[in-house]
Amino acid sequence: MICSSQISQPMNGLKDIVETRNFKAWLLDQYGVLHDGKKPYPGAISTLKNLATAGAKIVIISNSSRRASTTMEKLKGLGFDPSFFTGAITSGELTHQSLQRRDDPWFAALGRSCIHMTWNDRGAISLEGLDLNVVEDVEEADFVLAHGTEALGHPSGCVSPRTLDELEKILEKSAARGLPMIVANPDYVTVEANVFHIMPGTLASKYEELGGEVKWMGKPHKMIYESAIAIAGVNPCESIAVGDSLHHDIKGANVSGIESIFITGGIHGNELGLTSFDETASLDSVKTLSAKHNAFPTYVLSAFKW
């Protein structure tokens, strides 16, 4: 585990690290680092190109409910050249693979009937190929599967909108029955074009408060980092993670024994007192926030820039 409270002074750009350290694999978060969900951050596309040109193996590691292929399509649509990436792994991809293979004892013991919490406005998640039966009655379910926070899936494949309060009432009934829950996106919130959205991790935290068992897929848990490093085909000591969430990206890097770069202008921007893009956070404020989350980056950078 890499968990040193010694944080370096904020850097000017990635070029400093590329020229002084020999990291073969760069594990990049997407939201808050490359883009805001709607458009790339200034300089992100050219920085990615420079990093790839320098010979880095770049792997997207994302707490997204969606499959890895969907994530790559989104990045392409935002203007990022797919050829710059070695691959991608998402929490949604891990969830899909685990439910499909069932080679882990925990997943092997699951039944086939589930309550499915998903998205509506953001686009529902397909369960095709998983041999699952979506049910609406908690009494008929074997487990709860949380891909989103906006809707409830139906046996027909359609979804109907639900409020957070309505979903939490379903969770109360599920916890009372002792159903396990799989959360396909551990993020609590995300920022999309400066608008905060509640994510499935919030439902999972509520479920744990109710006494329910939660299987957390994705960051900050080690499994997704191991998958990303395997895609790159390198050793952990040859990898560095880049992210804007202390709790997920930086904590996950600490737990996985790899170094990290904290992008301050993302999800923690307001907490750090930042008011504009590429504004530099004070080292003291970063240290205080890192201690609060018990997550310590190796390097600090205001934005993903060269």
Regions found by a protein language model. Give the residues of each.
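Asp-based, Mg2+/Mn2+-dependent phosphohydrolase catalytic module
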Residues: 2-30, 35-54, 64-89, 93-306
